[in-house]
Amino acid sequence: MHTYDFTPKYEKLLTPDIVSLLTQIHEYKGEQALFIEAKADALTKLVEIAKIQSTEASNKIEGIYTSDERLKKLVQDKTTPRTRNEQEIAGYRDVLATIHESFDYIPPKSSMILQLHRDLYKFSGASYGGHYKTSDNVIAETDALGNKTVRFQPLPAWETPEAVDSLCRAYEEAVGKGELDPLLLIPMFILDFLCIHPFNDGTAMSWLRR
């Protein structure tokens, strides 16, 4: 059984440089209300650009591509997906929209992670959407000659559900204390989640839920 405790790792991350960056980010966050009011149109355009870039980058991680023109139309929900790749891009678009619009109401729980993963594949109808991996997997690298090297061995499939539950509980407990900055807790959660690698497909895209 894997247990997670964010506090020891968190304390090691509190270097002067990181503390300075956290302070600056929180200062800028306090000023953003004025920016939103004064530059609403510019902010809307930036959000749309960010959605397109996020969709492109996250799907490329999974080897999913389409043309720039098709990608833009899919993200803007102005066309119907034609291929399997486009179906998965459309699923990502909808999940990203759900998170963008309702992030305050999305708890870091196993059931919610599975729901978002299911929605990633709602257009393709993939049977593994919304289910944790059913077989063990490895993170491997293939060189130019076709030789594979195992770079990382994630948790076995049978340990995955309990590990995700444990990780989510540890994160909620850490946030609930109010003593640890979520700006550091979030990337720590994501790294542990990726190390579990809980899905047969779509793990790299699933970290966007946070």
Annotate each language-model stretch with its function:
Residues M1-R210:
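FIC/Doc superfamily catalytic core
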